[in-house]
């Protein structure tokens, strides 16, 4: 018997066969290269959407907490018995001053900031009476180096400025020396106090 030779594939059949042979390889490449990218993009989109929802949900809470903390700081330097209902917001534009309030009897508190160590802000709440005397201070130096710059937030440091007249600015050494090893933080507190004094003199004292 004569052995039949294999039938030669026509051109169209040959191309189809080659394409069929390549299909598994292309599918494998897609799974190995493209599919992970698609999955990663989908995950990123889902995470972004969840973060947006979370931010929308927490933003009002954060804002409320910030307002509560600021209110507590204002009240902490005012006479005992002062309440939130006694405070009136003051619109201020003095550089580095972030807020101010006054009371019906003429007391005022100015919130100011200054860059301390590594550029981190120190926040000061300075209370003034009707004569312009600095009656109380509160200093948030929690952003400064613990045990060094953070000491500027202790009353043993800033308490020396209580009783100072707003008729002149304060400076290191007059009446309080800088804390050893924390000159930058000490200067930040002084700068913030002086900003508060400027605000009081220019935007609160004598203004109805």
Language-model segments: which ranges?
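Flexible, solvent-exposed loop/hinge segments and secondary-structure transition points
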Residues: 17-208
């Amino acid at each position: 018997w004569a052995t039949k030779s294999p039938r030669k594939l026509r051109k169209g059949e040959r191309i189809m066969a080659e394409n069929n042979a390549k299909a598994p390889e292309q599918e494998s490449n897609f799974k190995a290269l493209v599919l992970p990218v698609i999955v990663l993009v989908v995950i990123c989109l889902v995470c972004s959407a969840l973060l947006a929802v979370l931010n929308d949900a927490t933003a009002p809470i954060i804002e409320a907490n910030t307002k509560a903390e600021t209110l507590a700081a204002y009240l902490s330097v005012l006479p005992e018995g002062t309440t939130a209902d006694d405070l009136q917001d003051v619109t201020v534009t003095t550089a580095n001053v972030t807020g101010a309030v006054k009371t019906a009897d003429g007391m005022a508190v100015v919130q100011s900031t200054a860059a301390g160590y590594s550029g981190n802000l120190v926040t000061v709440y300075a209370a003034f009476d009707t004569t312009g005397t600095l009656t109380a201070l509160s200093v948030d130096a929690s952003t400064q180096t613990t045990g060094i710059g953070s000491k500027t937030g202790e009353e043993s440091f800033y308490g020396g400025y209580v009783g100072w007249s707003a008729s002149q600015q304060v400076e290191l050494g007059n009446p309080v020396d800088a804390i050893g090893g924390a000159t930058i933080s000490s200067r930040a507190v002084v700068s913030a106090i002086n900003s508060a004094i400027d605000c009081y003199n220019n935007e609160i004292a004598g203004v109805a």
